[in-house]
Amino acid sequence: MLYTASSFKNFTFFHVFTSLKSPQYYFPLIIFCLLLLIVGYIIRVKQINSTKRKLAFLVDKRTKTISRQKDQIEEQNRLVKLERDKSDELLLNVLPQNIVEELKSKGQVAIKSYQNVSVIFIDIVGFTKIAERNNPTYLVNKLNDLFSEFDSISEKYNLDKIKTIGDAYLAVGGIGGQVELSSINCVSAALEIQLLMNKLKDFASSKNEEYWEVRIGVHTGDVIAGVLGTKRIAYDIFGNTVNIAKRIESNSEPWKVNISESTYKVVKTFFNCSSRGKISTKNTGDIYMFYVNGIDDAFSSHGTFNSSSWFRDYKNFSAKSKIDFYGLEKYAIDFLTKKLAKNLLYHGPHHTKDVLEAVEKIAFNERVTPEGFILLRAAVLFHDFGYIDKYKENEKIGANYAREILPSYGFNTSQVTKICDLIMSTRVPQKPNNQLERIICDADLDYLGRKDFLSISSNFYNELKDYDLVESKNEWDQIQIKFIQNHHFFTEYSINKRSLLKKKNLEFIKDRALKNKYTK
């Protein structure tokens, strides 16, 4: 046993390092171990690299799969968006944009009432007889072409097409928009349709072909609007305004644009109109009508609004502004009519309307900014409000009314301050400090240089006499002579348009005072 154990010890690995051997014995062993380590390292590196390649392959494969899936999802989203856009486009063909947005967000559209919208009704004259002598296919195609042109014009002027009924075309302006701007757009569209029909007439006449005539009617009032149906939805408007628009159209003449008095009051500033009588309605009474002869020369370029004109800037300002001037004007005139004393024969609501018309004319020719134009008109509405409370030195009271009321109609603090300054500038003797003040001062006394001076002067005398501020016509003439002699206009427009007749009116008063002859 001792021998065997001793022999085993001599042959163990540990014996190699414990036994005393020569260096030549250890060197090969060390080399072998190093080689073994190197080989092991190389194998391990190859294993790691192989694993990396496998992982990189898997990652690349997964990345390509994800990228492919992403492309598929994006394509699906694109197709969904395309279909949604098509659906929206189809909806927009039958519904106004704000209604489409409400329908998409809420899933339904509430029935709403809209105040002071403008409805345009167009009808082809004698269509029944036209249909009798024409092929139905030709007739439908021609109607489609014509109504497509009407659609383009309606879209240009931001009108919402409501429907076509046979040969009748119905559109509306002002659903969710400003009254003044939508009424202007509605009448502008009517004039452009009139121009289109004239061009089609000339073209047909040159080929000895039949041409169509249309009647156009526009009315401004209140409507109820909503979406009808669930499967085949349709947007429609209802109310007496629609019926009146139809009556206005049917009482028009071919090639004419016929508008109601309510529309005329909104657009008369920008269009040349002529009165043409009235019609009786069952629920509304008599409605006065006006033909629109064209656009006011100040804004016209070959019969259409000049795109580079002041009017373009005014429309842009109105579209962005929150000011509701039409609502303000209606409120102010109604308030003055109710509150002003009936013996104010000069300073009544009619005077405010007169000055408003004058300030608009002067402002056009003086080319004030769109904002300045609005401020001037607002100041005119309030410049006689003070007469509600007291007769003398009432401008300050009018300014106080303006400060209280104007913010409710979209005027900001800076605009209200400017309007109050304009009201104060109308005090006599007038001392205007800027362009707007010069304009309102000239507008307030515009009648001095007009043909209706004598009748207005007579009303002023009767008013002053009723307030015991003048005793006789002779005294009144002396007051007028002194006042007119010291008065002078400030704007170029008034100087050129009113000075000559003002001088003649002054001479007449002087002559009458000298002869001591007065009209009753």
Q: For the regions a protein language model found, what residue spans apply to each?
A:
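His-Asp-centered metal-binding catalytic motifs of divalent-metal-dependent phosphohydrolases/nucleases
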Residues: 355, 373-390, 394, 398, ...
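Divalent metal-dependent phosphate-bond-processing catalytic cores, especially two-metal-ion Mg2+/Mn2+ enzymes
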Residues: 293-295, 300-324, 340-370, 382, ...
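Catalytic NTP-binding/metal-coordinating core of nucleotidyl cyclase/transferase enzymes
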Residues: 74, 81-93, 101-188
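Alpha-helical transmembrane segments and their helix-membrane boundary motifs
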Residues: 2-36, 44
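Cytosolic regulatory/linker segments at or just downstream of nucleotide-handling modules
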Residues: 223, 251-316, 479, 493-494, ...
